[in-house]
Structure formats: C-alpha cells, structure tokens
Amino acid sequence: MDLMMPNDSMFLFIESREHPMHVGGLSLFEPPQGAGPEFVREFTERLVANDEFQPMFRKHPATIGGGIARVAWAYDDDIDIDYHVRRSALPSPGRVRDLLELTSRLHTSLLDRHRPLWELHVVEGLNDGRFAMYTKMHHALIDGVSAMKLAQRTLSADPDDAEVRAIWNLPPRPRTRPPSDGSSLLDALFKMAGSVVGLAPSTLKLARAALLEQQLTLPFAAPHSMFNVKVGGARRCAAQSWSLDRIKSVKQAAGVTVNDAVLAMCAGALRYYLIERNALPDRPLIAMVPVSLRSKEDADAGGNLVGSVLCNLATHVDDPAQRIQTISASMDGNKKVLSELPQLQVLALSALNMAPLTLAGVPGFLSAVPPPFNIVISNVPGPVDPLYYGTARLDGSYPLSNIPDGQALNITLVNNAGNLDFGLVGCRRSVPHLQRLLAHLESSLKDLEQAVGI
C-alpha cells in the first residue's frame, strides 16, 4: 500500500457522478489488406494474452485507518482482464455516428474504484471495415497527454509488425536525473520564493500591457455564454479528421501560425453554432489555450516551457479574414509578454487562469461572476508518420477530455500523420446537438480558405 500524492488524491476527492475525472481516447484502425472476418477477434485475443501488469495498472484507491479513503493506493495481484478489456460490436448499419453514441455512453460512466482505474474497449462492426478502441484511465493515474504518449508506444512504424503490445505491460522508460545536492535544493527554493514575490509586479505588467497595447486578454474579460454553466453527468462525444495541408494553406496565405488557423477554424464553428442557438454573445468568446513559450532560438534547448494564454476568438466579428488576424494578434501579444517572465511565474499565472473553476460548484458563483474563459482549445503534438497496431493502420486518434462545472464544452485535437484529429466533449444537457459543431468546423474552414484566396 502506498500513500497518494496530494494532486492524485485531489482528482478522486472532486470526482462525482456529474464530474467523472477520467481521460479518454478513441482510436480508429484499418485492418491490413486481405484481413478476414476474424481479424478483430484474433487481435483482441493477442491483446489480452499480455498477462503481466505494470504497477500503475494494478492499483486502486484503498481505505486505511478504519475508514479514511482516497489517500492511499492498494495493488491487485489478480487482474480480471475480461473486466478491463471488452469487445463489442455496433448494431447495423455500423455508422461512425453509432460508434460515437457508444463512445459517449462509455465516456459518461464512472470507473469502478474497487478495481484498477482503467478500461479498454475494442469495437467492431463499422460498415467500412475499420474497428475502434476506446480507452479510459483515471486522472489520478495519469494525465491525458501522458496517456496518449503511452498508447503511442504500443504502435509501430512497420506495417508488417504483427506484435500486439498492451499499454498495461510496457516496460517503464529509464529516467535520468541530474545529481542532487543541498545547494541545488536551496537554489530551487530561493527561485520559487523569488517567483512568488515577483508575482504581483508580473500581474501588473500584464494589466499594463493589456491597457496600453490592447493586445492581451485578462481573466474575467470573457462574456457569459451557454457553455459556462453547471454540467450534468451525461456526456456527448464527437470526432472528425481534417487534412493538415488545408490548415497549412490557410496559415501560409494569412501569414499566421498553424495554431492560429486552428483557433480561427474553431472560432468560426462556435460562432455558427451559437447563432444557430440564438445564443451568440455581443462580446468575443475567450479561449484558454495551452502553448509552448519557447523561442525559435531555444527550440532545441530541451526541458519544458509550457503555459496557458487567453485568446480573443473574435466570435463577434463576421469577417473570417479579420477574425483570424485578431486571433493571431491576441496569441502573439500574450505569448510575447509571458515569454519575458520566469518560468515559475508563467506557471503561476497559468494556474490563476484556472483557479476560479474550483469555485464553480458554489451556488450562484457561475451566474454572478464572469467566467475566466469560455472554452479550452488544446492542440496536442502527435505522430508525423503512419503507425500500425498488429498490422492495422492507425486511421484516427481522437482525444476525449473531461469537463468541469463552468466549462460544458472542450475541444482537443492531435496531429496524426498528415491529419488533425478533433475530439469534442460536451455536456449532453447544456450543449445540445454537439455533432453540429463538426459540420460547422468544415464550414468555418471553407470560409477561411475563401477569405484568404485559396
């Protein structure tokens, strides 16, 4: 039995029926040419034949001290693989829409805390011959990006590699840490203390830049929207892929970044959706965007320099060309100021953006206080080249996040071998007809292509 880290325990304490705290992913695979009707069954049999489990896939919350829960891990020595790995088939006609409906139900249900906190579902029956895998793991075990990287380690660049690796028995990667001594620890403590002391001046600097340059977006400048409400327990998931070349063409013609073009594509789709619902705010929606703050000169320096910025999505603007330039200016202004700050201050300011969401459950808070932002839009790096799983080609990889109170819609996308794979998760009650956003994303991209002369 091991004690939990406080941040791991937090995800278990805040979880409820309305707020599942697992992360998920939906992957689509195309069997190799000539594969027979038994391919998926045989694939699943080879998958579950991996009968050794790394510690992370054996642990579940334990109760200690006569009733204290959610502070320690217990480890199962006898894993019921048939419970954790399940094979399902879609009803006829086996549309992608049917797969997404099943995925929505799977993403809604809580993981059983009496068992290790993960599930994997193999789904066949798609009318185009592909099959799917939906995986979910509790956030107390692993974060979404790490889970995606773990899943990618089961894949191979060799289309003839027939081995079916399992995420639960991959050998841990060796960790290399620099030697630690008392002086380095003291240096770290002084660095953190200096960052805390400097936080207030840094915040003033951000405010001054916003006022003088009118480029930055500060927390609580977001309007109230239909997305910033309490969420129910039911989820709806939507997923679709777009060619990265189309987005790159918009990027080049508009003179912006790929991420700017993606944000503009999302902004146009959100504008279409909100107009359709007669719910478009007069002021622009604000997105929280995780970004790399590393300069081009430091691109190969190693380490992590990641924070979050707030982006003006210009959803009140009708012209797509003007909208994408507004988004680009907003992102450039935010990243420029944040890149001048020490890393710990960047992380602290990013945490301040998220802090109000911890109060979202307080009665009346969401209606009384402007939201810090309206939506999270994340663009996650993924594989550049085609990958295969037991000779089946990875055709789509769709990340599915969780949504807290006050954030009823999440958009996460990943780069996958020349495509951008979008995964959308929404509160089933608060964001009706979520799949309409997929059509609006396509319409928005076409608008951008036309606006920049493609």
Curated annotation (Swiss-Prot):
One biological process term in Gene Ontology: glycerol metabolic process
Reactions the enzyme catalyzes: an acyl-CoA + a 1,2-diacyl-sn-glycerol = a triacyl-sn-glycerol + CoA; a long chain fatty alcohol + a fatty acyl-CoA = a wax ester + CoA; di-(9Z)-octadecenoylglycerol + (9Z)-octadecenoyl-CoA = 1,2,3-tri-(9Z-octadecenoyl)-glycerol + CoA; hexadecan-1-ol + hexadecanoyl-CoA = hexadecanyl hexadecanoate + CoA
GO molecular function: diacylglycerol O-acyltransferase activity; long-chain-alcohol O-fatty-acyltransferase activity; O-acyltransferase activity
GO cellular component: plasma membrane
Activity profile over pH: Optimum pH is 6.5-7.2.
Broad class of enzyme this protein falls into: transferase
Entry's induction text: A possible member of the dormancy regulon. Slightly induced in response to reduced oxygen tension (hypoxia) and by low levels of nitric oxide (NO). It is hoped that this regulon will give insight into the latent, or dormant phase of infection.
Recorded metabolic or biological pathway in which this protein acts: Glycerolipid metabolism; triacylglycerol biosynthesis
Active-site positions on this chain: 139
Keywords: Acyltransferase, Glycerol metabolism, Lipid biosynthesis, Lipid metabolism, Transferase
Tree of life domain: Bacteria
Coiled-coil portions: none
Keyword Glycoprotein: no
A Pfam family per the record: WS_DGAT_cat
E.C. code: 2.3.1.20, 2.3.1.75
Family affiliation: Belongs to the long-chain O-acyltransferase family.
Function: Catalyzes the terminal and only committed step in triacylglycerol synthesis by using diacylglycerol and fatty acyl CoA as substrates. Required for storage lipid synthesis.
The name this protein goes by in its record: Probable diacyglycerol O-acyltransferase tgs2
Annotated organism of origin: Mycobacterium tuberculosis (strain ATCC 25618 / H37Rv)
Gene: tgs2
